[in-house]
Design a protein with these regions (language model features):
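Structural beta-sheet core signal
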Residues: 45-46, 160
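Feature for exported/extracytoplasmic and membrane-associated proteins, marking the mature portion
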Residues: 139-164
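Active-site nucleophile/metal-coordination loop of metallo-enzymes that catalyze phosphate/sulfate
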Residues: 1-43, 50-145
Length: 164
């Protein structure tokens, strides 16, 4: 049974899964409004894994960097997707798809195409620590296309900065 004080994802009304669509609409005017209305020439998204509202809210006044966002930008509390895992959220930002569409729910899962447990973000078998060692083409089991490619088709240049 789900505890009554659990917070459920608000898909379509304030969930992490709504972030890509919100950015798409703000930059291109295409699609539904999303989390925040308005059109913009530039949008900057800082995606800091595991730094949710319960960490941000009590620190926002203490750190100038966070306070700047509060005063000069847009800060909004949203719900996590389900499951609330790095794999699901990173894949959502890369593809624009929630877990139910991308198929990436967890850090590790059984993949029938290779008949083993894989680590999709590392593209490796469960017992391997070597990135890219999975012996199947990603196109066979992962979503194709990226959120950034969709933006490019709409004439929007986008950039991603992340660890290699």
């Amino acid at each position: 049974m789900i505890p009554p004080d659990s917070v459920r994802p608000r898909y379509g009304a304030g969930c992490f899964a709504d972030v890509p669509q919100t950015i798409r609409q703000q930059l291109t005017g295409q699609g539904e409004e999303g989390l925040v209305g308005g059109r913009y020439k530039k949008v900057v998204l800082f995606f800091v894994d595991a730094f949710g509202w319960r960490f941000f809210a009590p620190r926002r006044e203490s750190y100038p960097f966070l306070r700047h966002f509060d005063e000069q930008g847009r800060v909004q509390q949203i719900t996590a997707q389900f499951p609330s895992t790095t794999s699901a959220h990173v894949t959502c930002m890369q593809t624009g798809m929630p877990p139910a569409r991308s198929g990436v729910f967890e850090w590790q899962y059984y993949e029938p195409e290779v008949d083993e447990i894989i680590k999709p973000l590392l593209w490796a078998q469960l017992d391997s620590h070597v990135r890219g060692s999975l012996d199947i083409e990603p196109e066979k089991i992962l979503p194709q296309g990226t959120f950034y490619q969709e933006l490019a088709v709409a004439g929007v240049a986008s950039h991603i900065f992340q660890p290699a």
